[in-house]
């Protein structure tokens, strides 16, 4: 109750921006979030058996869907984060394990779809009874065999520790369950013919090699599948108490006919009717006991899409989505300029039985599902990366020794430390924080294999980069690059991220590698494009993954507090140093390697001792004091290099060496610029390109004309170059949304914020917190009277921060003509009147006095304009830039909802005690109501002023 009491005031004050439902629904979601936090954070240190309430119980108690819960939880954490810190400590976010739970749900949803498709291809539904005429799988009644297979998989999956729980391993376990079903389900229920060579291509003299055939079809490893099948058989023997059949010849007369029994275990009468029911009961009990112990969500629902708790849509966070939305892929991977907004996961195609009934043989594996992409990239790791040596090649060693000092020992030692920090038990969530020595041998083997894959990939790409750099320099001395600490950490982080992304671990997800390696998002963004360019064999799924990461880095992560981008920006734009220091945005020094080794208890074995007790100054970003006092050429605020000029410069200077050089170091190939100016220029050009793509997509969705689109893009360009501070600690979409509305206002276009938000919700990168929670740091003198850090809705940010900052830029754009929506007639209104602004009515300029009753028939009091407020009022032209009264009185809410709320309160019959507070009623609101009665002229009201409350609109439900 303590957490709810302390957060209740936040709930009441933020009701209009928290959700799109009724107040009761919003309060219900809020209570669910509170209860989940208490159950996770308040029970720390208790035995697992005493953990109490689980998430599935919370969802049922508050009648919430999974998707709805995860849409509101991030916003809840933003609003009450400081309270959670005070109650539960600064590490509450890590202990909450919200991101891990999201990933687990996404994986289970993908695995559930994969299992449904595979089962329907292999076996008849409903125990051979004809299904109904509907083509939708989710309306068909699954058989007990179907339920048994999914339940067997869940029990098998729950036996794995959190360290190795990942989509790739789970898929292999699921295929092992399919193998068990194939050899035990009665032949009459099969949807395939075992003799058909197109179904099971791997054969020998003894019959079909089932394991090899399934590996070929589902892209799994034979070794991994054999190990998973052994685990499944052990589970059947230990939990279900079934004994393997010792007479192979007897078994081959039934389900094992024409199947090579080598490597397979057959349990006689295992799935006969009586045995099946008892086995289901045992598995149900085993799984439920595991749920009560671990407190996880009931994954049985993922075998049935109609489950009431499942819901539909995408999980909050943008990157994590429940599969089910069709998507199209680009054939070309590039920098964010070539990415598209359509990036939602693809839904699996519905199964259509073939005319001859042999669906398994005639259907193809659905491409581009989360499971199939994971298996494809895993095959690349097995076939291309795993066979490579775990040490630098001869050519790479020659590059190391050609430096001013042989850097071989430094590089190998660094790789061991950083990869050891990433691939340890502490890296895989709170549940595994006791390191690998307390995990099972299987976990340690899995982790060591992943570390070796990342190491081999790192050496492979590093060799390719060195080869390319040496060609540019016409020499093999790459000292400045190969001795750069930050560059190597970025390369190792990128390699490890690709390995982790391939296996899709539940607990070690981006940006975890940034924290483990000690780098920032801005650092990693420097190597992504080069990494892709120098690894030709990289699967397109991993290229897309890196592309999506680069977008995330550019859109918000590089702008967050503590980004090394600010350490370069303060050199390139010294005029921004005061604001950067005021907000405390500068990055902390990169932790040394010996500190990382000690923190993660990493043993280097036979490697040489650590030579990294102190990082050389030349490789680190210079401190802001040194950067601001050194003499250098300053990049003019409004100068912006073109891509052509950047391309010309890249021919004369290796981009990686300049990108990771000291910010204050002169760049001889850039006309006297410092490396910071060059790097910031490249970074901001990428920001501009990414913004251009999103502006185009959103404007097209809003059906805005090309002229409006160009104005919005021009405004964003000017903000990037002249008002860069608007992006500090914010998301670029927040600036784009405000630019679209601001341009619509000065272009006299009837476009509301509600329409913009409604269209933005349909964008694949949309996250509700983008428009619900915008960072502001109120100065000592602000219009709102607030001081310090805060998070406000997008409309408050637009009125209080955006417009005062960019108003001169909007004035320069000018109203010009009156562009209209495509396919809509132009309005013939007066050019001097602005859309969404209230009409002004005559109201005499009276001296300060008490409110006066102005109607004999209506209980209406009017507070005349006070002279004390005159200084704060805006001119009519200035008012036109703001979101004004007349559209709504609450954020994202329509006027009709305001009127309904007023009528409801008036008709409730409740007596309100106390006096009215006339200070909260805008004079203009009353003046407008009087003008409707008296027919007063709007023009004569100019003397009154135009102070208006902040516009707000309620989200559509």
Swiss-Prot record:
Protein name: Retinoblastoma-related protein 1
Region (Pocket): 369-808
Domain of life: Eukaryota
Region annotation Domain A: where it falls in the sequence: 369-569
Organism: Triticum aestivum (Wheat)
Role: Regulator of biological processes that recruits a histone deacetylase to control gene transcription. May play a role in the entry into mitosis, negatively regulating the cell proliferation. Formation of stable complexes with geminiviridae replication-associated proteins may create a cellular environment which favors viral DNA replication.
Family assignment from sequence similarity: Belongs to the retinoblastoma protein (RB) family.
Localization annotation: Nucleus
């Amino acid at each position: 109750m303590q957490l709810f009491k302390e957060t209740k005031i936040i709930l009441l004050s933020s009701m209009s921006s928290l959700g799109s439902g009724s107040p009761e629904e919003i309060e219900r979601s809020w209570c669910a979030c509170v209860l989940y936090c208490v159950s996770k954070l308040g029970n720390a240190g208790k035995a697992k058996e005493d953990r109490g309430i689980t998430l599935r119980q919370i969802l049922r108690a508050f009648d919430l869907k999974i998707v709805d819960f995860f849409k509101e939880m991030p916003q809840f954490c933003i609003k009450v984060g400081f309270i959670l810190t005070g109650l539960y400590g600064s590490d509450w976010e890590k202990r909450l394990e919200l991101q891990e739970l999201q990933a687990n749900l996404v994986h289970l949803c993908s695995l559930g779809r994969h299992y449904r498709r595979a089962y329907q291809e292999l076996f008849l539904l409903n125990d051979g009874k004809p299904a109904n005429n509907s083509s939708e799988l989710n309306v068909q009644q699954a058989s007990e065999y179907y339920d048994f297979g999914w339940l067997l998989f869940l029990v098998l999956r729950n036996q794995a520790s959190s360290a190795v729980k990942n989509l790739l391993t789970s898929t292999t376990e699921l295929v092992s369950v399919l193998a068990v079903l194939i050899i035990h389900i009665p032949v009459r229920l099969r949807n395939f013919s075992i003799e058909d060579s197109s179904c099971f291509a791997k054969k020998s003299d003894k019959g079909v090699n089932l394991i090899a055939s399934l590996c070929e079809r589902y892209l799994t490893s034979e070794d991994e599948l054999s190990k998973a099948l052994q685990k499944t058989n052990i589970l059947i023997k230990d939990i279900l108490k079934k004994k393997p059949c010792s007479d192979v010849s007897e078994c081959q007369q039934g389900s094992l006919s024409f199947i090579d029994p080598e490597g397979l275990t057959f349990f006689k009468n295992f799935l006969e009717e009586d045995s099946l029911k008892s086995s289901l009961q045992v598995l149900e009990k085993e799984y439920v006991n595991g749920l009560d112990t671990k407190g996880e969500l009931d994954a049985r629902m993922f075998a049935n899409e109609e489950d009431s708790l499942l819901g539909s849509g995408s999980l909050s966070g943008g990157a994590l989505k429940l599969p089910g939305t069709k998507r199209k892929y680009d054939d070309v991977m590039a920098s964010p300029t070539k990415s598209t907004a359509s990036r939602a996961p693809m839904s699996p195609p519905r199964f259509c039985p073939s005319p001859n009934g042999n669906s398994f043989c005639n259907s193809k594996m659905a491409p581009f599902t989360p499971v199939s992409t994971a298996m494809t990239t895993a095959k690349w790791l097995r076939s291309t990366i795993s066979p490579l040596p775990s040490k630098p090649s001869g050519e790479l060693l020659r590059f190391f020794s050609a430096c001013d000092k042989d850097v071989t020992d430094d590089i190998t030692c660094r790789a061991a430390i950083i990869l050891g920090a990433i691939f340890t038990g502490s890296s895989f969530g709170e549940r595994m924080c006791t390191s690998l020595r307390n995990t099972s041998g299987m976990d340690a083997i899995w982790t060591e294999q992943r570390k070796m894959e990342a190491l081999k990939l790192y050496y492979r790409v590093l060799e390719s980069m060195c080869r390319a750099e040496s060609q540019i320099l016409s020499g093999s001395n790459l000292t400045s690059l190969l001795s750069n600490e930050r560059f190597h950490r970025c390369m190792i982080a990128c390699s490890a991220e690709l390995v982790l992304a391939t296996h899709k671990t539940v607990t070690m997800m981006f940006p975890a590698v940034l924290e483990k390696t000690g780098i920032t998002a801005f650092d990693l963004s420097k190597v992504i494009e080069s990494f892709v360019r120098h690894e030709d064999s990289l699967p397109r799924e991993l290229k897309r993954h890196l592309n999506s990461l680069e977008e995330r880095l550019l859109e918000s992560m590089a702008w967050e507090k503590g980004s090394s981008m600010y350490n370069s920006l303060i050199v390139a734009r010294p005029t921004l140093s005061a604001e950067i220091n005021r907000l405390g945005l500068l990055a902390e020094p990169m932790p040394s390697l010996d500190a990382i080794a000690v923190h993660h208890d990493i043993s280097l074995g036979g490697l040489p001792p650590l030579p990294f007790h102190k990082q050389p100054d030349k490789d680190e970003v210079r401190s802001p004091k040194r950067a601001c006092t050194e003499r250098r050429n300053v990049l003019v605020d409004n100068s912006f290099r073109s891509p052509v000029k950047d391309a010309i410069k890249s021919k004369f200077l290796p981009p990686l060496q300049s990108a990771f050089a000291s910010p204050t170091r002169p760049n001889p190939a850039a006309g006297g610029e410092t490396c910071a100016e060059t790097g910031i220029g490249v970074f901001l050009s990428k920001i501009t390109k990414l913004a251009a793509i999103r502006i185009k997509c959103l404007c097209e969705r809003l059906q805005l004309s090309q002229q409006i689109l160009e104005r919005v893009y021009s405004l964003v360009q000017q903000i990037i170059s002249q008002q860069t501070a608007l992006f500090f600690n914010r998301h670029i979409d927040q600036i784009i949304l405000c630019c679209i509305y601001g341009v619509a206002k000065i272009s006299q276009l009837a476009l509301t914020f509600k329409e913009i938000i409604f269209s933005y919700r349909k964008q694949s990168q949309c996250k509700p917190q983008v428009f619900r929670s915008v960072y502001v740091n109120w100065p000592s003198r602000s219009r709102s009277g607030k001081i310090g850090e805060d998070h406000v809705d997008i409309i408050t940010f637009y009125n209080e921060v955006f417009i005062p900052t960019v108003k001169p830029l909007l004035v320069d754009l000018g109203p010009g003509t009156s562009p209209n929506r495509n396919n809509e007639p132009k309005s013939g209104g007066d050019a001097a009147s602005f859309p969404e602004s209230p009409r002004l009515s005559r109201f005499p300029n009276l001296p300060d006095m008490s409110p006066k009753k102005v109607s004999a028939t209506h209980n209406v009091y009017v507070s005349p304009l006070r002279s004390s407020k005159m200084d704060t009022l805006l001119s009519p032209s200035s008012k036109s830039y703001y979101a004004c009264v007349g559209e709504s009185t609450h954020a994202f809410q329509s006027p009709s909802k305001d009127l309904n709320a007023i009528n409801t309160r008036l008709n409730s019959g409740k007596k309100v005690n106390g006096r009215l507070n006339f200070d909260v009623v805008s004079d203009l609101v009353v003046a407008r109501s009087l003008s409707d009665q008296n027919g007063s002229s709007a023009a004569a009201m100019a003397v009154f002023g135009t102070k208006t409350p902040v516009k707000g609109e309620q989200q559509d439900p």
